[in-house]
Swiss-Prot record:
Phosphothreonine, modified sites: 622
InterPro entries cross-referenced by the UniProt entry: CRAL-TRIO_dom, CRAL-TRIO_dom_sf, DBL_dom_sf, DBS_PH, DBS_SH3, DH_dom, GDS_CDC24_CS, PH-like_dom_sf
Source organism (scientific name): Mus musculus (Mouse)
Gene symbol of the encoding locus: Mcf2l
Assigned protein family: Belongs to the MCF2 family.
Protein topology in the membrane: Peripheral membrane protein
Ranges for region Disordered: 555-627, 956-1033
Compositional bias segments (type: Basic and acidic residues): 607-616
GO biological process entries: intracellular signal transduction; positive regulation of transcription by RNA polymerase II; Rho protein signal transduction
Pfam families, A to Z: CRAL_TRIO_2 (PF13716), RhoGEF (PF00621), SOS1_NGEF_PH (PF22697), Spectrin (PF00435), Spectrin_5 (PF23289)
Name recorded for this polypeptide: Guanine nucleotide exchange factor DBS
């Protein structure tokens, strides 16, 4: 790091003293472990400034003092020598050796340590002058004096200036000392200058009294314990300062060598760690400063207590030393604070840079993703609603993206602020800021460009839709003008005014110039849109052409006629009407072939009379009618296509806005426990439905825009895939139950808020059910306007298929509500029919009581007709809401279809039929709600039994066909069965039947009815006692089923549609009627107007009309009742008619 600081210690060099002995080896070894109070600390910049240290920065000695007061504290306490602080006349430090009887007993090591320590205290300048030793031996002997002087002179480590000895005061000792000193003077002079003093006043001649302590007759205030305490504190403080300096040096080195991290987390950790260590260092500095100030106050305490107190030089030196140490600590703290501020700033800038870089990476990724998405939005829409939806999506996308754009711009401003604050990484920040600004501007420009394209598309589609609407309204206007009113002059003038008024609105609604459209909207015109523009323009031109033709025609009609209109007799073929017209009368003219075809389809369709209208008027009216129908077909097609697109979009919206969000971890906290892991229950197979529709339906419908009447083929090609709706509807009760339990979940509310939906999710979950039912309504409308078109048959088949799917869905919904059935309903085959009926039971063998009760108390049963069995269930209504309110069905019994037979008609009620079991051992009388429902059930049961019989026939490969399918009814001369019938008429119960044996068709492999209690779960052929339903009061409901075929009292019956066999030639047939021969099998399809019946000859595949007058008397009293069993026999039971002229008989199945 730049501006690095290092710590150095500065000391003064010690001047050599020729009088001081050399330090021994032990002293030198301990030198590295001692602290001098004069040691100072300061911070200097780098190595260049390290050489600039001067002597003025030094405090005391350079050499490290071998000892400190704490090390020899016990030796100093003996006080055999002390440094009082007094000075000689030339400033020499005075060391006093007081009277100490045990002086000779002091070990040399202790004496040397004390001398070394005391001589190291004064400054270098004072120590250089030399020390004055005052030896007080007034109470000692001469021998001790001599030994003490010689010991001191030999062991004194510094320069000696003078030795003053107060000799013994005793007479003998003083005399002895005088004599001994005279003889040994030369010995003393050779070592040290020694002055033998006899009294204290004589001492005062060498040293002023103010520099001597009180025990030497001076006035110097000295307390040895206080001096020792101060010296220990000062040296301890100096050591603390040194350790603090070393700590700062180590910390500074650590900071200087720290590499800047490359991520936010590491940088934060480094900054936090360094800040924590810096706080610890500052704490130690504050403790050192506090300690120093406390010592300084203690040194100044005597002067503070008494102003007259005199301060000696040593005390002043101590104060100066502490002050210098404090000053250096303050300077060190200031330098460290400055260094730390730079280091902290760099770390903080590094952290800011890492945050900026991390934010830059995130924002850049988001902006790149958004730019890719906006670049992928190339669709300009194919309709006005589609473009509006795209604009809405773009607005939502822009609002959603604004967060990232705002974040990017804020990050760019943050980078600019870092640059203004003189961040060290300007070269890295500046390019990123420019790139962020460029990305934001590029995204904004792309959104603006996209919005401009969609606005252009919206404008173009608005023009196209306006033109389309104008054309449609014009065609509607043309179609709504009644042709008969236009034949008069006033009517023509009124119609002409309508035409001209409408044409005036074309200026503001039409597309004026196609080339201008191409030029103005070139940027959005793709191939599909170009074709759409051309089609709209062509439609507009054709509409204008139609208007101009109508205008010209009306102008001619509106012109005033110059001569009156002459009455003209109508053409005979146009006026011919017969009470019983023959088909040939409508086919007599080539010009009326279309009417003839219409009448062939159904004479009940009344032809429009155009006798008073000219031929040209009739042709024009027909063309205009076709145009009107084409417009209606287009409207139905547009509705079908628009609703299909909206339906697909709604499905996608639900799947993305709700279903996908259930897997979003960010939304997991909003999902309640009851909703977790139940997405498949809530949404069923909606995703499968979406993919089917999105992949197939819109594209298929768009291919039929030009020919809407062909849309039936689109449905037929995909009819099998529509079966997926059955699965969705079967799951709907579970979905709705789950929704009711969790509808107040915050998850749904949040999703609805994000999607901006006004309706809740359950409304959208109902969309598939609504859609599958909507198709049949739209197909009905399309078929209504396409009856004579090419695709009418496909439309009819598609409608029937959709209705079949709806029926299957409805039946399956009932089927899953069955309870109590132990077997697998899937084993019973396809569900064909289901419905509620009133049921009576009749047991022929015993059970008389039950039979009687059954007549009066019908049971309400819900029947399920399968391919292999019919199930009887009891319907139970449920309480609740929605699908929970749907009924359930309790299983009661089932009948195997291999042992079932039916009797189609029961006398007394057109709504009743019979199902009998095991050769009429058990008979169930079924009453349907309406005759139509009864006919549907009978036909379906007949188909099942017939298919089973056909299977038996195919299984019998070794037997030949022995019986004919149909037998003529008896003639008046013979009431016995026909020749081919080898069985006698047998009366069954009270019924007269004419059984036809087909035993020859039955092979040995024919399935046999199961024994009672076997093969069918919970099957009981003894029907339970009738329920006490009550409410049956009509006489019709009390009729015994045996009354169905009683003889007598039956009048002529009206002929009903069905299959019959012709038993004699039609001798009264006309040239224009369908010719019938004996033995032909015919089907009476429907009754037309004017007494005609439309009949289809199944033998020759011819169709035609037969006058009812030729059939009414022949069929006046005929009636038939057919019964069928798949057990290998077919029975035709009919009433023997006494009338002689029967031509048609019901065809045996």
């Amino acid at each position: 790091m730049s501006d690095c600081w290092c710590f150095i210690f500065c000391k003064e060099h010690v001047r050599s003293n020729p009088l001081s002995p050399q330090h021994d080896g032990a002293s030198r070894e301990e030198a590295d472990h001692q602290v001098d109070v004069s040691d100072g600390i300061r911070l200097v910049p780098d190595k260049a400034e390290a050489t600039a240290a001067t002597a003025s920065d030094e405090i005391m000695h350079q050499d490290i003092v071998p000892l400190c007061a704490a090390d020899i504290q016990e030796q100093l306490k003996k006080r055999f020598a002390y440094l009082s602080g007094g000075r000689g006349q030339d400033g020499s430090p005075v060391i006093t050796f007081p009277d100490y009887p045990a002086f000779s007993e002091i070990p040399d090591k202790e004496f040397q340590n004390v001398m070394t320590y005391l001589t190291s205290i004064p400054s270098l300048q004072d120590a250089g002058i030399g020390f004055i030793l005052v030896i007080d031996r007034r109470q000692d002997k001469w021998t001790s004096v001599k030994a003490s002087v010689l010991r001191i002179a030999a062991s004194f480590p510094a320069n000696l200036q003078l030795v003053l000895v107060l000799r013994p005061t005793g007479f003998f000792q003083r005399t002895l000392s005088d004599i001994a000193f005279k003889f040994n003077r030369d010995e003393f002079k050779m070592k040290v200058p020694v002055m033998m003093l006899s009294s204290v006043p004589e001492l005062h001649g060498y040293i002023d009294k103010s520099q001597l302590t009180e025990d030497l007759g001076g006035t110097l205030d000295y307390c040895h314990s206080r001096w020792l305490c101060h010296r220990t504190a000062i040296e301890s403080f100096a050591l603390m300062v040194k350790q603090t300096a070393q700590m700062l040096q180590a910390f500074g080195t650590e900071l200087a060598e720290t590499e800047l991290p490359n991520d936010v987390q590491s940088t934060s950790l480094v900054l936090s760690a360094h800040t924590e260590k810096k706080a610890k260092v500052k704490e130690d500095l504050q403790l050192a400063l506090k300690e120093g100030n406390s010592i300084l106050e203690s040194l100044r305490e005597p002067l503070a207590e008494s102003a007259a107190h005199s301060v000696n030089q040593d005390q002043l030196d101590n104060q100066a030393t502490v002050q210098r140490l404090l000053a250096q600590l303050n300077e060190t703290e200031a330098a460290f604070d400055e260094f730390w501020a730079k280091h902290q700033q760099k770390l903080e800038q590094c952290l800011q840079l890492r945050h900026f870089e991390q934010g830059f990476r995130e924002v850049k990724t988001t902006l790149d993703s958004m730019s890719q998405k906006i670049a992928a939005f190339t669709d300009v829409g194919n309709s006005l609603a589609h473009v509006q939806h795209l604009l809405k999506d773009l607005t939502a996308f822009e609002e959603k993206s604004s967060v990232a754009v705002d974040k990017a711009r804020a990050l760019s401003l943050e980078g600019q602020q870092l640059i203004e604050n003189r961040h060290y990484a300007v070269d890295s920040i500046h390019p990123k800021c420019e790139e962020l600004q460029h990305l934001c501007d590029h995204f904004a420009s792309e959104v603006t460009r996209r919005r401009g394209l969609l606005s252009k598309s919206l404008e173009l589609h608005s023009l196209l839709e306006t033109s389309m609407k104008w054309s449609d309204e014009g065609i509607f206007l043309l179609a709504s003008q009644p042709v008969d009113k236009c034949q008069s002059q006033d009517g023509a003038e009124a119609a002409l005014q309508e035409i001209e008024k409408f044409l005036e609105t074309g200026a503001e609604n039409k597309i004026q110039e196609l080339n201008e459209i191409y030029k103005e909207y070139e940027c959005i015109l793709n191939q599909d849109l170009l074709e759409h523009v051309q089609k709209v323009f062509q439609k507009q031109e054709s509409t204008e052409e139609m208007f101009h033709r109508r205008q010209a025609s009306l102008k001619k009609l509106a012109a005033k006629q110059t001569r009156p209109v002459q009455p003209v007799a109508p053409r005979p073929e146009a006026l011919t009407k017969s009470p019983s017209p023959s088909p040939g009368s409508w086919r007599s003219s080539e010009n009326s072939s279309s009417e003839g075809n219409a009448l062939r389809r159904g004479p009940y369709r009344r032809a429009k009379s155009e006798m008073s209208e000219p031929r040209q008027g009739r042709t024009s009216s027909t063309g205009e009618e076709e145009e009107s129908l084409a417009i209606l077909r287009r409207h139905v097609m547009n509705e079908l296509l628009d609703t299909e697109r909206a339906y697909v979009e709604e499905l996608l919206c639900v799947l993305e806005g709700y279903a996908a969000e259930m897997d979003n971890p960010l939304m997991a906290h909003l999902i309640s426990t009851g909703l977790q892991n139940k997405k498949n229950i809530l949404f069923g197979n909606m995703e499968e439905i979406y993919h089917f529709h999105n992949r197939n339906i819109p594209a298929g419908l768009e291919s039929c825009i030009d020919c809407p009447e062909l849309v039936g083929r689109c449905f037929l090609e995909r009819m099998e895939e529509f079966q997926i709706y059955e699965k969705y509807c079967q799951n709907k009760p579970r979905s709705e139950s789950l929704w009711r339990q969790c509808s107040d979940c915050p998850f749904f509310q949040e999703c609805q808020k994000k999607l901006d939906h006004k309706l809740s999710l359950d409304s959208y979950l109902l969309k598939p059910v609504q859609r599958i039912t909507k198709y049949q309504l739209l197909l009905k409308e399309m078929l209504k306007y396409s009856k004579h078109c090419e695709g009418a048959e496909d439309l009819q088949e598609a409608l029937s298929s959709i209705l079949g799917i709806l029926k299957a869905v409805n039946d399956s919904m009932h089927l899953i509500a069955i309870t109590g059935y132990d077997g697998n309903l899937g084993d019973l085959g396809k569900l064909l029919m289901q419905g509620s009926f009133s049921v009576w039971t009749d047991h022929k063998k015993g059970h008389t009581k039950v039979k009687e009760l059954a007549r009066f108390k019908p049971m309400q049963r819900h029947l399920f007709l399968h391919e292999k069995a019919v199930l009887f269930c009891k319907k139970r209504e449920e309480n609740g809401e929605g699908y929970e309110k749907a009924p359930s069905y309790s299983y009661k019994q089932s009948l195997n279809m291999t042992a079932v037979g039916i009797t189609e008609n029961v006398k007394g009620d057109t709504k009743k039929f019979e199902i009998w079991y095991n050769a009429r051992e058990e008979v169930y009388i079924i009453q349907a709600p309406t005759p139509e429902i009864k006919a549907a059930w009978v036909n379906e049961i007949r188909k099942v039994l017939t298919s089973q019989l056909q299977a038996c026939r195919e299984a019998s490969q070794h037997r030949a066909l022995e019986q004919s399918h149909s037998l003529p009814l008896p003639t008046p001369s013979s009431t016995s069965p026909t020749k081919g019938n080898t069985r006698n008429v047998k009366k069954l119960e009270d019924r007269k039947t004419d059984p036809l044996s087909l035993e020859g068709y039955v092979s040995s492999s024919l399935p046999k009815p199961p024994e009672k209690g076997k093969g069918w779960s919970k099957t009981s052929h003894s029907l339970e006692a009738p329920e006490e339903d009550g409410g049956w009061s009509s006489a019709e409901e009390l009729i015994n089923s045996s009354d169905a075929e009683e003889d007598g009292g039956v009048g002529p019956k009206k002929l009903v549609p069905g299959k019959y066999t012709v038993v004699m030639d039609d001798e009264k047939g006309g040239p224009d009627t369908l010719a019938m021969r004996s033995g032909d099998m015919v089907e009476v399809v429907e009754e037309g107007a004017e007494g005609l019946w439309y009949v289809r000859d199944l033998t020759s595949s011819k169709e035609g009309w037969v006058p009812a007058s030729s059939l009414s008397t022949l069929l006046g009293k005929s009636s038939s009742a057919q019964c069928l069993s798949s057990s290998g026999k077919i029975h035709c039971a009919r009433q023997l008619c006494p009338e002689p002229a029967e031509i048609l008989s019901p065809e045996p199945v």
